[in-house]
Each structure stands twice: as C-alpha cells, then as structure tokens.
Amino acid sequence: MQTYLTLLETLLTTGVDKSDRTGVGTRSLFGYQMRFDLAAGFPLLTTKKMHFKSIVYELLWFLSGNTNIAYLNQNGVSIWDEWADKNGDLGPIYGKQWRNWAGRDQIHQVLTSLKTNPDSRRMLVSSWNVAQLEEMALPPCHVLFQFYVANGRLSCQLYQRSADVFLGVPFNIASYALLTMMMAQQADLELGDFVWTGGDVHLYRNHFAQAQEQLKRQPYPLPKMHIKRAKSIDDYVFEDFLLVDYRCHAAIKAPVAV
C-alpha cells in the first residue's frame, strides 16, 4: 500500500490548510486517484492494524438495506454510534439508497446487468439522493461507484466526495474492494482493479502526528481474501470471509471528527 503512503506524504507537503464543518481544521487537496489490482492481493493497510471485523459487518449491514445501528452493536461494531439518534436510527443513508431508492434496488440492477449486459456503461450505484439528504444523519461521503467489465475481469471505481485520509479512506478502500470481490463472485467474473477517486481529500489537523508516524513504517505484502460463495449477494455472513496472511504494524489511534 505504498500508494496510500504517497497520498499521506503529498497531503502533508503540498496540501492547503482549510477550515471545515467539524471545527478541527484540515490540510486538503482536490482530486486524487489510486488504483489497486485486486488479483495481486486484498488492499488492507499494513502500516497500521485495521479492524477487519468492522469492515465486513458494515458492508453486510449496507447490503441488508438496514440503517439502524442495532445490528452493528450486536456484532461489536461501534463506528456509527456518534451519528445515530436515541433509537439508533441514521435516516436513509447508504443501505437504504443502495437497496431501495424509491423502490429501486440498485445492487440487484447492477448484478443483473453484469450477468446479461456486462458492456453496459450504466452499472452505477449512487447514495447521493438529493431529496433525502436532510433526513440523513450524515450525507454520504462515498457517493457513487461504477462497475466495468473487460476481458472477463470486473473493476470498480468509487467517487468519494469527502475523504478523511487517515481514518476513513483505508476503511473505504477495503470495504469497496471486498464488495467488488463479492459482485465478481456472484457474476462469475475474475477480479480486475479497484479505483479510488477522491474529491476533497483531507487530513484533519489532529491526525498530522499519526500520519507522520505511519510514514516511518515499511509496508508488508498484502494479505489474501478468501470468500465462501453464498447463494446470492444477500446471503453472505461474516464467517464466509477469511483474511489470510495479514501481517501489519500496530494500530495508531486517532480521534474521529464529528
């Protein structure tokens, strides 16, 4: 994941200092892209320990269409707690938009197209439902993703409008890489690339020291991901995912900007 470390270094050395909604302040740049060959390994950061369980359970939660944190909490995942209301609800965020945007199941539509019309340029899933943004606890940061098939290989590109590079981006890369692997499996396709594209790409000011610490670390080889094939995209469970040969440096704690 040297590609990610290059982004950290670029932000620290050439980014622009800006104010932001949270009041913490950021150093940011606009427009950045990284590419990961999924056949070469699972792009899970090795220069700090990542909480793999949270990545998997959150993705399964999105795919279920659920927007209440009860399922996450029951499985020891607390990453959405700060934004939930007293009942655990988050409003019509990612899962709702993916699986039921005005009655449309975007995930099912893309899977159908992958199987029947893989050259389509319309294989997109969007979470940016303008009519419902004010009902969401947090407007989508990872807004839109598109699939592309070439030579029997499935690739995915994500557009992330707001990218918290230290905490959020490594998590998002792994999550969408995993989703791409699941979609490829369900559509009987080989693995292509995961392309991450960021809009406002930023480091919070209270993450500078952590980023500098991470830059001192040498990346390890990427782990492998083994997925037991489920009957459908809706039938995967946590136990279907096996992370193999994940060697990493120690975790680096950093505060979440709410």
Swiss-Prot record:
Subunit structure: Homodimer.
Positions of (6R)-5,10-methylene-5,6,7,8-tetrahydrofolate binding: H51, D164, A257
Catalysed reactions, semicolon-separated: dUMP + (6R)-5,10-methylene-5,6,7,8-tetrahydrofolate = 7,8-dihydrofolate + dTMP
Pathway given in the UniProt record: Pyrimidine metabolism; dTTP biosynthesis
Binding, dUMP: R21, R121, R122, R161, S162, A163, D164, N172, H202, L203, Y204
EC number from the UniProt entry: 2.1.1.45
Keywords: Cytoplasm, Methyltransferase, Nucleotide biosynthesis, Transferase
Name listed for the protein in its UniProt record: Thymidylate synthase
The family this protein is said to belong to: Belongs to the thymidylate synthase family. Bacterial-type ThyA subfamily.
SUPFAM superfamilies, per the entry: Thymidylate synthase/dCMP hydroxymethylase
CDD domains, A to Z: TS_Pyrimidine_HMase
Active site, UniProt feature: C141
Gene Ontology molecular function: any one: thymidylate synthase activity
Gene, per the UniProt record: thyA
PANTHER family, sorted: THYMIDYLATE SYNTHASE, THYMIDYLATE SYNTHASE 1
Alphabetical list of InterPro entries matching this protein: Thymidate_synth/dCMP_Mease (IPR045097), Thymidate_synth/dCMP_Mease_dom (IPR023451), Thymidate_synth/dCMP_Mease_sf (IPR036926), Thymidylate_synthase (IPR000398), Thymidylate_synthase_AS (IPR020940)
A GO CC term assigned to this protein in UniProt: cytosol
Gene Ontology biological process terms, A to Z: dTMP biosynthetic process; dTTP biosynthetic process; methylation
Cellular compartments annotated: Cytoplasm
Disulfide bonds: none
Superkingdom field: Bacteria
